[in-house]
Amino acid sequence: MEQDSKFQANCSLENNSQGKVPFISKLAYGMGDVGCNFSWMFVGNFLMIFYTDVFGISMSAVATLMLVSRFWDAINDPIIGTLTDKTHTRWGRFRPWLLFGAPITALVLILTFWAHPEWSQTAKIIYMAVTYCILVLGYTCVNLPYGTLCGAMTQDIDERAKLNTSRSVSAMMAIGVINIVTVPLISWFGAGDTKYGYLAVAVLYGIIFAACHLFCFHKTKEVVEVPVEQKLPLKVQLRSVMKNKPYLLALLGQLLFGFIHYGRNADMLYYFTYVEGSATLFSYYSMAIIVPSIIGAACFPLVFRKTGNKGFTAAIFAFLTGITMIGLYFFSPNGSAILFYLFSALSWFFFSGFNTAIYAIIPDCVEYGEWKTGIRNDGFQYAFISLGNKIGMALGTSLLAIALGSAGYVSNAVQNPEVLSIMHHAFSTIPGVLWIITAGCLCFYKLNKKQYKQIMTDLENKKK
């Protein structure tokens, strides 16, 4: 009788895992990425210029922090990933991390944007290093389980595509709002005191970050069967990952994504402030890209339906992103505004399609790995995806800081031609070429819809 009840429970769980995800859960999952962006996009777009132009920290110190902090990530990301796999609560494996991690991370975000320009350079660097490293850890504790949650909500490949579309559309809306309102909000809250303006915005965004993740926690549900807990040595898990070719390509895609996207984002405010002459243009630019970004994200399922391959879909979007970003080099919002904003809109239309596709790949790679090796370690795999993205981010932002510092960047001053040239190319041609390279790499992704369905059939037969 006990065996019959267990069998019925497992069958029920499997049916649920292949079923439709309720609309409110899709909405809540998307809201999770709204929260993520109100912290991490704020950090990616504004923290570097906050450190150099508001806090008064040298460009070389900022570059060093961005690189050194990745060693910290290399330690904490796999640990957090393993801990999420070992978490077993009445709420599931991943959702509890949102409940407890989001409020704490929101507080650390506020502390990170609390400037003390009157301190000594040594004190500033210590404060920067401590708050940033704790912020990175807190973000990992929330974002890693959040990203893995998609694979626990359903095993249906089309439902996962819809979940990731909801995530990406929500993210693009959040990014647009952040980019449009942040500069005016800093000015409005600060009333002439930029230091206070940044702090007030951090408080607001921290509240939004926590609220979105708490909503995500309450309205989502983990239905995929939790595997029997296995005590697997690190080398065994690493070996299983190395045999997962689709996952390795997804990891490479995330590394390149982090390098290109966050490096360019860190440059954008410098570009508009110093090359084009006005930080206000950044808000106009953001207004031009918000609607195309949302539409581009929503187009992912349509393109995927035609290709049947998420990796190839990502490659198409990446290639077109690269072409349009290279085109941006030849136009200026001051001299050729229509063409500048047209190419900006197109580049973000294609980028948001890529953004949806590259995250939609990850849950499918987990099932491929389970089918290939017999090991299912969602959290561990997502940890290295997160780490790859962060390493890319660190390399992109630190190389930008090193290049600007070496060329003679001086905060809040007229920049020399070499500095302006670096800012211009970092906004257009460099990311454009790198997006085309990314497209070439993702063309080798072979896990298509037909193969995935066969993998799921094989896995279900094994469970029976």
Please report, for each region that a protein language model flagged, where it lies by residue:
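Membrane-embedded alpha-helical bundles of multi-pass transporters/translocases
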Residues: E2-K464
